Structure formats: structure tokens, C-alpha cells
From Swiss-Prot:
Pfam families according to UniProt: Sigma70_r2
Residue ranges crossing the lipid bilayer per the database entry: none
DNA-binding region: 126-145
Native source organism of the sequence: Staphylococcus aureus (strain Newman)
Lineage: Bacteria, Bacillati, Bacillota, Bacilli, Bacillales
GO molecular function: DNA binding; sigma factor activity
Keyword annotations of the record: DNA-binding, Sigma factor, Transcription, Transcription regulation
Protein name in the entry: RNA polymerase sigma factor SigS
Family according to the record: Belongs to the sigma-70 factor family.
Motif Polymerase core binding, residue range(s) on this chain: 29-44
InterPro entries: RNA_pol_sigma-70_dom, RNA_pol_sigma70_r2, RNA_pol_sigma_r2, Sig_transdc_resp-reg_C-effctor, WH-like_DNA-bd_sf
Highest taxon listed in the record's lineage: Bacteria
Gene of this entry: sigS
Known function: Sigma factors are initiation factors that promote the attachment of RNA polymerase to specific initiation sites and are then released. Sigma-S contributes to the protection against external stress, thus playing a role in cellular fitness and survival.
Listed GO biological process terms: DNA-templated transcription initiation
Length: 156
């Protein structure tokens, strides 16, 4: 499928996402980044997959936009400094709060659970994760429940 056809049929997804997150400042820049990502996604989409193109684009563009927000605010999130130091004499170290939480979560998980979580956060569906990890769908569901249980037990 040519990108012009994809664009004509699905460009409203970009407008919807920008409206959903109330983007008014830098609207054109975000639109352009999402349009480039839409082109990239249209190149890797497999029509034989069970997911429709519109669903595929919406999910991946939504996660991409969230990643853009995180990158933009990465230096604004958390500043960590030593408790003993009354003044900042050294360069402060910046950490993204989400990255710190993910690091804590990843420490609790085994290798299969970490891979599942990574793929899930990238926007893959369960059946896609099952194909990538070469596991059955029921095993993927068990891994999902295990990750959920560990997170609830340790972070709630």
C-alpha cells in the first residue's frame, strides 16, 4: 500500500492523538514527528497480521507520542543529590521517575518476565509477544499474571 493512501485514510489519527493530549504549543512539530513515525510504521506493517492497520497505527503512534513527552521532560522530573551535602557543589544527577520505577520492577522479574514487559510497553499485543518469544498464548498470559502479581505485591 502506498503511503499516500495510508495518509489519506489514517491522518486523522494524528490529529486525534494531539487533541487527546491537548497539544497546542508545537502542534506542527509533533504532527511532523508523528507523520514520519506513521510512514515508518506503514513500512513495517504486515497486512497478514490479525491487527488492522488503523489499530496498529493508533497504538504505536500513541506510545511514540508518550515517549516524546517523556524525552521532553526527562531533565525536569527528579533531581537527586546527597543528603549530607547542604549545597550543590557538584553537577546534579537527573533521573526520569519512570525509568527509576522500571529499574525497580525489572529487578524483581526473571528474564522471560522482563522480555514480556519490554515488549508489552512497546505496544505489542499478546499474540505478537507469543510469536516473538516463541511461546504459547496461555504461557504469555501466565507470565503477564506473574508480572502483575509481583508489581502489585511490591508497589501497592
Amino acid at each position: 500500500m502506498k503511503f499516500n493512501d495510508v495518509y489519506n485514510k489514517h491522518h486523522k489519527i494524528i490529529h486525534h492523538l494531539l487533541k487527546k493530549y491537548n497539544i497546542s504549543y508545537n502542534y506542527d512539530e509533533y504532527y511532523q514527528l508523528l507523520l514520519i513515525k506513521m510512514w515508518q510504521l506503514s513500512q513495517i506493517y504486515k497486512p497478514s497480521s490479525k491487527q488492522s492497520l488503523s489499530s496498529f497505527l493508533f497504538t504505536r503512534l500513541n506510545f511514540y507520542l508518550i515517549d516524546l513527552f517523556r524525552q521532553q521532560n526527562q531533565l525536569k522530573d527528579v533531581i537527586l543529590c546527597e543528603n549530607n551535602s547542604p549545597t550543590l557543589t557538584e553537577q546534579p544527577t537527573y533521573f526520569n521517575e519512570h525509568d527509576l520505577r522500571l529499574q525497580d520492577i525489572f529487578k524483581l522479574l526473571n528474564q522471560r518476565e522482563r522480555l514480556w514487559l519490554k515488549l508489552y510497553l512497546e505496544g505489542y499485543k499478546q499474540f505478537e509477544i507469543a510469536e516473538i518469544m516463541s511461546l504459547s498464548l496461555s504461557t504469555i498470559k501466565l507470565i503477564k499474571m506473574s508480572v502483575k502479581r509481583k508489581c502489585q505485591h511490591n508497589f501497592n
